[in-house]
Amino acid sequence: MLLSKFGSLAHICNPSNMEHLPVKILQPVKVDKEPFEKVYQVGSVVASGGFGTVYSDSRIADGQPVAVKHVAKERVTEWGTLNGVMVPLEIVLLKKVPTAFRGVINLLDWYERPDAFLIVMERPEPVKDLFDYITEKGPLDEDTARGFFRQVLEAVRHCYNCGVVHRDIKDENLLVDTRNGELKLIDFGSGALLKDTVYTDFDGTRVYSPPEWVRYHRYHGRSATVWSLGVLLYDMVYGDIPFEQDEEIVRVRLCFRRRISTECQQLIKWCLSLRPSDRPTLEQIFDHPWMCKCDLVKSEDCDLRLRTIDNDSSSTSSSNESL
C-alpha cells in the first residue's frame, strides 16, 4: 500500500482541466446539505495510490471516525447515475449494498467538487487490513483461516444479492477488527454491476486475476471471483500468494509449501481450476467439507466463536460459466 505525506485537503478544491468529462458532470449539484468542511474535521492521510487518497477524518457533530476517499474526476473510468446525477460507479455500488450488513464497508455520504468526488465511509477501530495481519502473525492456522474465509464468502454473497460484483477480492481490501475478528470488505473502486454475460474490462489486482483474463481479456464475474477467493485462501494458510507471474497464472503452477489438511488443499485446487466452468459456485464452497468444520477465530484480544451460517437463506443460484 502506497503512503503519502499530504497533510490537508487543500488540493481537493483546486480546479483542473475538465474538458474531457461529460457536460452533465460539470453542472453544479444542488443538494440541501451542509458543506463538507462544516460537517467533517480533516485528519491525516491513511493511504494514497492510483485509486485516489484516503483520509482519516471525524464527524464534527459527534466525533464519529470516518474515512474520506478523494477521487479525482480525471481518474474515474466507470460512471453511474444516482438521482439523475453522474457519479463514479463506486458510489452507486456502495449505495446498492445495504448498510445493515456488517461485512461490507458502510457509505455515509458523498460530495462533488469541481474536480473530484469525496466519498465518506465508516472507519471502524481498531482494525488492520488482512495483509498486515498476516504479515505480523504469519500463515493462519486453518481454524482462523476458515472463520475469516467464511466471512469473506458471506460478504461476496451479500454483494451478489445486491447485484454487485467486487472484482478486487484480496487481503488488502479486507479489514480485520482486532477485538473480535470480524472482517469488512472495502474498496469497491474496481467493482461492477453483476451480470451473467462476459466482462471485457478489469481494473483489479493482476496477481489475483484469473487465467482467462490474462490470456483472453474476458471473464465471467462469478467464476473470476471464485478464482480470487482461491488465491486469498492460499494466502491465508501459506502467508503469501501462489502466483507472481502471468505464466504461473495461466499454467496454474501451485506449490503447497507446508502441510495443510487434504480438505483445505482440495478446496484451493478446486477454486483455482484452469477452466472457469470447473470451479465451484459460491454455495458449493459454503458446502465444502473443509468449510463445514467447527471454527474458532483467535483475535488479538479475545476468542470469537463465529456465528453458524444458514446455508439455506439468502442463497444465490449460479449457473456454470464457460468462455
Curated annotation (Swiss-Prot):
GO CC terms: cytoplasm
Broad EC category: transferase
Coiled coil stretches, renumbered: none
UniProtKB keywords: Apoptosis, ATP-binding, Cytoplasm, Kinase, Nucleotide-binding, Phosphoprotein, Proto-oncogene, Serine/threonine-protein kinase, Transferase
Ranges where the Protein kinase domain occurs: 40-291
EC number: 2.7.11.1
Reactions catalysed, as given in the entry: L-seryl-[protein] + ATP = O-phospho-L-seryl-[protein] + ADP + H(+); L-threonyl-[protein] + ATP = O-phospho-L-threonyl-[protein] + ADP + H(+)
Location in the cell: Cytoplasm
Example GO BP: regulation of mitotic cell cycle
InterPro entries: Kinase-like_dom_sf (IPR011009), PIM1/2/3 (IPR017348), PIM_Ser/Thr_kinase (IPR051138), Prot_kinase_dom (IPR000719), Ser/Thr_kinase_AS (IPR008271)
Recorded GO MF terms: ATP binding; protein serine kinase activity; protein serine/threonine kinase activity
Modified residues (Phosphoserine): S4, S190
Mod. after translation: Autophosphorylated.
Phosphothreonine, modified sites: T205
Residue numbers annotated as active site: D168
Binding sites annotated in the UniProt record for ATP: V46, A47, S48, G49, G50, F51, G52, T53, V54, K69
Family per similarity comment: Belongs to the protein kinase superfamily. CAMK Ser/Thr protein kinase family. PIM subfamily.
Biological role: Proto-oncogene with serine/threonine kinase activity that can prevent apoptosis and promote cell survival and protein translation.
Stated name of the protein: Serine/threonine-protein kinase pim-3
Lineage: Eukaryota, Metazoa, Chordata, Craniata, Vertebrata
